[in-house]
From Swiss-Prot:
The keyword Nuclease does not apply. It is a lipid-anchor. It comes from Methanocaldococcus jannaschii (strain ATCC 43067 / DSM 2661 / JAL-1 / JCM 10045 / NBRC 100440) (Methanococcus jannaschii). A lipid is attached at C19 (S-archaeol cysteine). It is found in: Archaeal flagellum; Membrane. Residues 1-18 form the signal peptide. GO terms for cellular component: archaeal-type flagellum; membrane. The modification N-acetylcysteine is found at C19. To M.voltae FlaF. This is Putative flagella-related protein F. The gene is flaF. GO terms for molecular function: structural molecule activity. InterPro entries: Flagellin_arc. It comes from the Archaea. Keywords: Acetylation, Archaeal flagellum, Lipoprotein, Membrane, Signal.
């Protein structure tokens, strides 16, 4: 009788250790995923808060609009990831070009001109990659 209770207790302890190890591995990977998601979210919020673009000049004709944007923040942005809206309508990518053409990134304290071949707008909205919206009214 004494031998079977020792074996039973040993089996129970081993089963508890295996379950504990499995639970630890599962919870550790879960918390690692949560931590990674929080880090990504924090970096996105940090970039969004430190992005400050200013529409400094708009020159518009019937078929072309030149929009000069100045980066007054501390975050490097990519102008080709901007979404441009004229009077609430999204301007297609093929109608947008940039001057200077080789400038892929807009660094702080620098400006870029976006050339839009589209109808003349009365309201312009530029949505950055971080989700910030910048408005300009021609009226």
């Amino acid at each position: 009788m004494g031998f079977s209770s020792v074996v039973g207790a040993t089996v129970m302890i081993i089963a508890l250790l295996v379950c504990g190890a499995y639970l630890y591995v599962t919870m550790d990977s879960y918390y690692e995923n949560v931590d990674e998601a929080y880090t990504t979210y924090y970096s996105h919020v940090h970039a969004k808060l430190n992005e400050k673009l200013v529409i400094t000049d708009v020159k518009s004709s019937t078929s072309q609009t030149n929009i000069t944007i100045y980066n007054n923040g501390s975050v490097v942005v990519e102008p080709d990831k901007f979404t441009i809206l004229f009077d609430g309508t999204v301007v297609p990518e093929e109608n947008i070009s940039y001057y200077p053409k080789l400038k892929k990134y807009l660094v702080p304290l620098d400006s870029i001109t976006i050339v839009v071949n589209w109808t003349q707008p009365s309201r312009i909205c530029i949505v950055s990659d971080n989700g910030n919206k910048y408005f300009y009214s021609l009226t």
